[in-house]
UniProtKB/Swiss-Prot annotation:
Transmembrane segments: none annotated. Belongs to the TRAFAC class translation factor GTPase superfamily. Classic translation factor GTPase family. IF-2 subfamily. Residues 153-156 are annotated as: G3. Residues 98-271 form the tr-type G domain. SUPFAM superfamilies: Initiation factor IF2/eIF5b, domain 3, P-loop containing nucleoside triphosphate hydrolases, Translation proteins. GTP binds at residues 107-114, 153-157, 207-210. Residues 107-114 are annotated as: G1. GO terms for cellular component: cytoplasm; cytosol. One of the essential components for the initiation of protein synthesis. Protects formylmethionyl-tRNA from spontaneous hydrolysis and promotes its binding to the 30S ribosomal subunits. Also involved in the hydrolysis of GTP during the formation of the 70S ribosomal complex. It comes from the Bacteria. Residues 57-96 are annotated as: Disordered. PROSITE patterns: G_TR_2 (PS51722), IF2 (PS01176). It comes from Deinococcus radiodurans (strain ATCC 13939 / DSM 20539 / JCM 16871 / CCUG 27074 / LMG 4051 / NBRC 15346 / NCIMB 9279 / VKM B-1422 / R1). This is Translation initiation factor IF-2.
Amino acid sequence: MSKVRIYTLAKDLGVDNHKMLEILDGLGVSYKSVSSTIDEENVEIIKQILADEAAEGGDAAPAAASAPAAATAEPEEADETPAAAAQADAEPASDLPHRAPVVTIMGHVDHGKTSLLDYIRKTRVAAKEAGGITQHVGAFEAKTSKGKIVFIDTPGHEAFTTIRARGANVADIAIIVIAADDSLMPQTREAIAHAQAAKVPMLIAINKVDLPQADPEKVKTDLTQLNLVPEEYGGDVIVVPVSAKTGEGVEDLLEYISLTAELEDLRADPKGQFSGVIIEGRVDKQAGVLATVMVQEGTLHVGDFLVVGENYGKIKAMTDSNGGRIKEAGPSTPVQILGFSEVPSSGETVVSAKNEHAAREIVAQRASDRRDEEDARERRKAQRSLADLLGPLGEVHTVNLILRADTQGSLEAIQGILARKETEDVKLNVMLAGIGAPTEGDVLLASTAEAQILCFNVTPSAAVTKVAETKEIPIKAYRIIYEMIDEVDRLIKGNLDPVFEEQYLGRAEVRMVIHHPKSGNIAGSYVTDGMFKRNAKAKVTRGKEVVYEGTVVGLKRFKDDVREVQQGYECGINIDWNDVQEGDIIEASEMVEVEPR
């Protein structure tokens, strides 16, 4: 009995993939994705359902009760219903028009990423446009039967993660290219880890299948070691054999990209407020500052004012992926912009302003907000309640690790020990484990995923150390394996729910109340015991009754603001409470972390 893939049947019958999955859900047919196969019996049932709907003028998916008992999936397919999940996540934005998917291609340096992009360019971009595309905006648009696909041509996964580290999600789909004659290499594992950290759908392209020594089955088997199980093995990872040299499988890859985009239901409002992301910025000797922007929402026009971080500019000229001048650009369109005075950083968000005055106001407000945040950060830390410090009870903490070692044996030994170190409260997640010194990509991944980099018998280069210092990512290197394990023990201990105790600081007697026009009533006090600190907890006692509990928001000695006042000195105490009275006793305390008992 022959079988047919779901997406192929949907295409042949002229319905979209979501509709096809709804019908299968109604029939009770199990599948893993739109590339799963169904048998002839179910194909005939689906055709009849669609014919009946066409005759009735309806489009509802059949109820499960109407499904024949024999309607079952192939045994290798798993019990999941993506259509139902997609419906549950549906947003009102479903009325918005679809946009093109934005795809990034990553993988090991010699596995053919550039060759694959070049082949797609050659066959999917008009000949007059293909030359010199990369020198314009680092991206290009490929035309397919399902619409356009935008490919970002960035130099490796490090650039991808730099954008992610700033909180931007510029890519919708990641293609991991793996050579059929080489299988998984260190950079392949890194690329997969970066894509997983970004939480974007992944497609695996096994390249160079035209070579005599190609072994795509080995690649698929090796992928399972990373918990990436191909569909033909019963998993949910789409694996496409391709050849960037002959073009074999490239059409299938483009089809799978379109199918993934359809299931992701990518939409944007071209009439809405503009927003975008900086892909890269550079200085051209002749033109000046150029910025590549991916339009995500709204439409960009020449003459618009844009704000990036604490800088703004007016679009003087705009270039599309072909190097041609354009006047406007909608969602999922990469453009190169001339108009900024300073080079923006990759991953920064871009918003529009009505005019220059509005742009200046946005920049001024952002600068003010940044200063306020810096000023308030210490105070917020000091004023956290005990509940804030403890966090949710029973929460399982995850420690993300990036491991580097000198040999595979060392790496396996370390991972074996780590597997025995996990507790009910703390989970150790090894995001990446590789042989050799840590790379800049490791640092960027650690920055994005809040991971720790631990090295055994290898040390980072000066360049990597400099990047790590800039990103404030510590790289810890060890020569003795148990010193590394001791560090892991410290990390586990540091991720356990902390234990805090309230410790007494001091006591003061209110001798006069001073009214301040801005700060309200200040307690003119004498510290009779211990000391007082700014931001300490304060408890006011009147007689034997506690009348107020709050925070010491300010301390003064004469006219000077001070951080603390010792026993035997007078001071002004501001507890942000106007009902303080002479004779009140103010007691100060602070929350101090103690060793778990």
